[in-house]
Structures are given as C-alpha cells and as structure tokens.
Amino acid sequence: MEKALILSIFIFSLLLGITSYSIYISFGPLSKTLRDPFEEHEE
C-alpha cells in the first residue's frame, strides 16, 4: 500500500512539473523568442 502511494505521488508530481514547465515556456518571458510558422508564411 505504501509503495503504491509513493509511486502515485511521484507520477502526479512529475506530470504536474512537466505541465507547469510547458505552460511557462509557452506564455512566460521566453515565449518572445519562439517563432510562429503561421506568421512567417502569411500572405
């Protein structure tokens, strides 16, 4: 029981960390350096 709880908490925090990092990259200060392929090929 204790092993399963620790594993589930680890997986949950790993997913939460990945989600938080991707949101930070998408909308944070580094988002200014991301290129937009749709804007480049707009006619």
Swiss-Prot record:
InterPro entries cross-referenced by the UniProt entry: PSII_PsbN
Q: How does it sit in the membrane?
A: Single-pass membrane protein
GO CC, one annotated term = chloroplast thylakoid membrane
Q: Where is the protein situated, by its record's location annotation?
A: Plastid, Chloroplast thylakoid membrane
Please tell me the species this chain comes from.
Answer: Cyanidium caldarium
Name of the featured protein = Protein PsbN
Q: Does the keyword Chloroplast apply?
A: yes
The record's comment on protein family reads: Belongs to the PsbN family.
Q: Which UniProt keywords apply?
A: Chloroplast, Membrane, Plastid, Thylakoid, Transmembrane, Transmembrane helix
What role does this protein play? May play a role in photosystem I and II biogenesis.
Kindly indicate whether the keyword Transmembrane belongs to this entry. yes
Question: What coarse category fits the chief subcellular location reported for this protein?
Answer: plastid
**Segments passing through the bilayer:** 5-25
Some GO term, biological process aspect, for this entry: which one? photosynthesis
